[in-house]
Regions:
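Alpha-helical scaffold/interaction cores of sigma-54-like transcription cofactors
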Residues: 1-676
Length: 676
């Protein structure tokens, strides 16, 4: 049922009535019978989810006991027995077994080649419908089906094997009338009338899909317990020193937002498994992404970066003006990540925890390899062709051909191969597991989500992440990072050979010897600093502070990249530091007057337009997609209009100079900052 939810929504958007069902093999006492079971209501859809989980964990097979138990428990599904020449001898017996459950919606399904059984079936019931298999809407697409089947089954083909066919084509009522009597065709309309699946207007099963309530000590509520942990964290951080008012106010503000949005349990759950990892001496990363802007996450020990010290903004993580799910990505040693997931699995239970499915889609390189094998193309040519496709054109084979004369030569040599590559690009090829994400729910997942067996006995969702988010599930990102494993091994070796119980937190962030290595570009193997381009920047910049490292990694990406030399010159005193307006100096002084970070964009919008930080982040998010589209279409003048539209007109006059300067600098680069 991988695409069931998305399919339903697309049908409804296009005013088509969705019919949702699944096929399974019923292993009866006499033979194996194929069944199609369809939902007649939302409750029936929920029962389909449960059945899908049963059959997905049992090789797509259900027993007689499974079928009888299932039909006894639900009346809101319709069952179709596939009646064919293989099982016709036992067809009445199988019908009687299903009918004995008292289920009224039992049908026989027929394909044209089995119409000689119609008389026997009519003697049992009048509930008979056509069940032609539909795989494509255009007979020209038959060859795509042939290709995908050959890839799946690892078969070979010749070009002459490819053909047009209407065998699995969508058939109109007139087409069906050529094969079936009217009374059978009319039963289709009856089935359509019986099936009335409608999803709730609100997110379905919101209570079931919510996070588990964290078990707090002393009968405290989640909100109060989180507040108590933050108080303890602040006191531990400042020890005997007085806690600055800015920290107290920031924590209280964040707690208010977290509690009002109902995410206290989320923080407690994340804090719990991070604490488990640290107790087990599993190295935990300092945090990545927008969660670094949360002081609550910092004082809990979830992250290791003080957001106040580094001017990070909480609203980029959790915006009180935008209902969105929090997203905390936590890195663990890659060799011990499974221990953390096992802990979560044991704590919350098998029925409540699952990995997330992903679908690997066919890109150009994969298509060339698959099609090359199917048509038995020389392996040396296949290898050469895939090397000639840049990663940025992996889904745009025509662009890759334009960029490479050698690839164009191969396209001329193998025209069918490249034509078919274009036709199968983007098709799902196989399922995989999300690299980091798991989901945890208060009620059993199977009440709302179809599951299948995943890694090490842990369930895997059949729905991908986008669908889970649409349903309201919160993803927990448990990442495995090789660099943390390397660091842990280094600490163990230091302890073993030098008898030092060294901790990374004890190493000063201004260590001169460390910066001597970095400024010389000796950073091979160091996360985010190891590419040749990055090493050149470190050398030219003469990096001597953590702020320089942060700036260099932020500059080394599309958009800000062209300001690298200006930044270096200003840092080294070779170029005067200027500001587009003196009012913005507090936000740009640390980066020598150059806009590098998203936080700076938000602060500028706050200053220039009078927005709250939450509103400023909304603006950034809302216009980013539009900006990207305009940028792709080279419509720079519209980009300027778009920027001006987000600024209050009454403030335009006061900050006219800022805006003019913003527009003088490469506006596309500025907008790319918003996107990134």
């Amino acid at each position: 049922m991988y695409g069931a939810y998305e399919f339903c929504n697309l049908c409804i958007e296009n005013e088509i009535k969705p019919l949702i069902g699944l096929n399974c093999v019923w292993e009866s006492a006499s033979d194996k019978v194929e069944l199609t079971i369809m939902a007649t209501s939302y409750a029936g859809y929920q029962r389909l989810i449960e059945l899908s989980t049963i059959i997905s964990t049992n090789n797509n097979i259900v027993t007689t006991n499974d079928v009888k138990k299932y039909l006894n428990q639900t009346r809101e599904v319709l069952v179709i027995i596939h009646a064919n020449n293989k099982n016709i001898r036992y067809i009445k017996n199988n019908y009687d077994i299903l009918n004995s459950t008292g289920h009224e919606l039992v049908y026989f399904g027929l394909v044209p080649s089995d119409m000689d059984n119609i008389t026997l079936l009519k003697s049992i019931t009048s509930n008979i419908i056509p069940i032609d298999l539909v795989l494509y809407l255009d007979e020209k697409q038959h060859r795509i089906y042939q290709i995908l089947q050959a890839i799946k089954e690892q078969k070979t083909l010749k070009s002459e094997d490819l053909s047009k066919s209407n065998e699995f084509l969508y058939k109109t009522k007139q087409d069906l009338m050529q094969h079936y009597p009217n009374e059978i065709i009319e039963n289709i309309e009856k089935v359509i009338w019986l099936c009335n699946l409608k999803f709730p207007k609100n997110k379905p099963n919101s209570a079931e899909l919510s996070l588990p309530k964290f078990t707090c000590p002393n009968n405290l509520t989640s909100n109060l317990y989180l507040q108590e942990l933050c108080k303890q964290g602040l006191e531990a951080h400042f020890q005997s020193r007085e806690i600055p008012e800015t920290y107290v106010k920031r924590v209280l503000y964040e707690l208010q937002v977290i509690n009002e949005m109902g995410f206290a349990d989320y923080f407690l759950i994340v804090n719990d498994y991070v604490k488990f990892a640290k107790i087990k001496n599993i190295m935990v990363g300092p945090g990545r992404g927008s969660v670094a802007g949360s002081l609550v996450a910092y004082v809990l020990g979830i992250t290791g970066v003080d957001p106040i010290a580094y001017n990070l903004i909480f609203e980029r993580f959790l915006n009180p003006e935008r209902i969105s799910l929090p997203d905390i990505d936590i890195d663990f040693e890659d060799t011990r990540r499974d221990e953390v997931i096992k802990y979560i699995h044991q704590k919350y239970g098998k029925e409540h925890v699952a990995y997330i499915v992903t679908f690997q889609t066919i890109a150009s390189k994969m298509a060339i390899r698959d099609l090359g094998r199917v048509f038995q193309v020389n392996i040396e040519d296949i290898n050469e062709m895939t090397k000639l496709i840049p990663i940025q054109y992996n889904f745009e084979i025509d662009m890759a051909i334009k960029q490479s004369p050698k690839l164009a030569w191969y396209a001329n040599k193998y025209p069918l191969l490249f034509t078919l590559t274009k036709e199968i690009l983007g098709f799902p090829r196989q399922t995989s597991t999300h690299a980091a994400g798991i989901v945890i729910t208060s009620a059993p997942l199977v009440t709302a989500i179809p599951l299948q067996l995943g890694f090490q006995g842990i369930y895997q969702t059949q729905f991908p992440m986008q669908t889970l988010e649409a349903l309201g599930l919160i993803k927990m990102d448990i990442l495995g990072l090789r660099n943390l494993t390397i660091l842990q091994n280094i600490l163990q070796q230091v302890s073993k050979h030098y008898f030092l119980n060294l901790k990374l937190s004890q190493i000063p962030l201004n260590d001169e010897k460390s910066f001597s290595i970095i400024k010389n570009g000796d950073t091979t193997g160091i996360f985010q600093l190891e590419s040749s381009g990055m090493r050149q920047i470190l050398i030219k910049m003469k990096v001597d502070s953590l702020e320089d490292i942060i700036a260099s990694s932020s500059l080394f990406r599309p958009g800000p990249q062209e300001y690298i030399q200006d930044y270096i010159n200003r840092k080294l005193g070779k170029q005067k530091v200027t500001y587009i307006h003196e009012d913005l100096k507090p936000y740009l002084a640390s980066t020598y007057g150059i806009i590098i970070y998203q936080e700076q964009i938000l602060l500028i919008l706050q200053k220039v337009a009078g927005y709250s930080l939450g509103k400023a982040d909304l603006i950034r998010r809302a216009i980013s997609k539009k900006i990207l589209q305009l940028w792709k279409n080279k419509q720079t003048h519209l980009l300027k209009v778009l920027l001006i539209e987000v600024i209050h007109q009454e403030l335009l006059r006061k900050y006219e100079k800022i805006l003019k300067n913003l527009l003088v600098m490469d506006l596309i680069d500025l907008m790319l900052l918003l996107i990134h």
